[in-house]
Regions:
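Extracellular, disulfide-bonded carbohydrate-recognition/adhesion ectodomains
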Residues: 27-171
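Short alpha-helical segments used as structural interaction elements across diverse proteins
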Residues: 5, 9, 52, 189-191
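Small-residue packing motifs within transmembrane alpha-helices
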Residues: 12-20, 178-183
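Bacterial N-terminal signal peptides that target proteins for export
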Residues: 2-14, 175-176
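Cleavable N-terminal signal peptides
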Residues: 16, 26-27
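A short, hydrophobic C-terminal helix/tail in secreted or cell-surface proteins
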Residues: 173-191
Length: 194
């Protein structure tokens, strides 16, 4: 592939990301889940967005100093919280932070969360993941009309355009009392030495 051809493709990809992010609209302010202290936000993208652009856009956001990433769902309780907070229709056709690395056994091997959390919980719609189609499916999406229990993940090709994505903001650790006390003691010691 020539440098000019590669540069043109890179420019198109960059332009696609910029336009997708520019067209992104938050449905509401980030919502906090008291169980883990994380915040969640559903982002709609006019004209749709591919998985890689959604991942990049999520990573450029922050809320109260916490960096964002595509949502990782680690339990049925967290899944129910998302459905209760945003509704099944609000999550429908939005990217998760779930992907299948190249070379994984198909259709259900190697699924990985973007933040490295263990993939011990899944919420696949019955019959999913199925790696349908000739191009394969390697990214997770909320789909199939989420039911009350949050059932409804599907695997899609990461290059397909979907309605948006869900961002999760991890909690920013607050200083513990012991750290505050130690810092105060250190400050007092340094002041007395002068």
């Amino acid at each position: 592939m020539s440098k000019q051809h590669w540069s043109r493709n890179a420019a198109r990809a960059l332009l696609g990301t910029v336009l997708s992010v520019a067209a992104a609209t938050a449905i509401s302010a980030p919502t906090r889940w008291d169980v883990n202290g994380h915040y969640y936000e559903v982002i709609e993208v006019s004209g749709g967005i591919v998985w890689a652009d959604a991942r990049a856009a999520a990573q450029t956001t922050s809320h109260f100093g916490a960096s964002g990433h595509l949502v990782t769902v680690g339990s049925a309780e967290e899944s129910r919280f998302l459905t209760a907070s945003f509704g099944g229709d609000g999550l429908e056709n939005h990217w998760l932070g779930l992907f299948q690395p190249v070379g994984s056994s198909e259709p259900d091997g190697g699924w990985t969360w973007v933040n490295g959390e263990s993939f011990s919980y899944n919420n696949w719609w019955p019959g999913e993941p199925n790696d349908f189609g000739i191009d394969g499916e390697n990214a997770g999406v909320f789909q199939h009309g989420i039911t009350g229990d949050g059932k409804g993940w599907n695997d899609l090709n990461s290059d397909w355009l979907v309605n948006g994505y869900v961002v999760e903001f991890d909690v920013v650790p607050e200083p513990t009392m012991l750290m505050l006390f130690a810092g105060g003691l250190l400050g007092l010691t340094l002041t007395r030495r002068r």
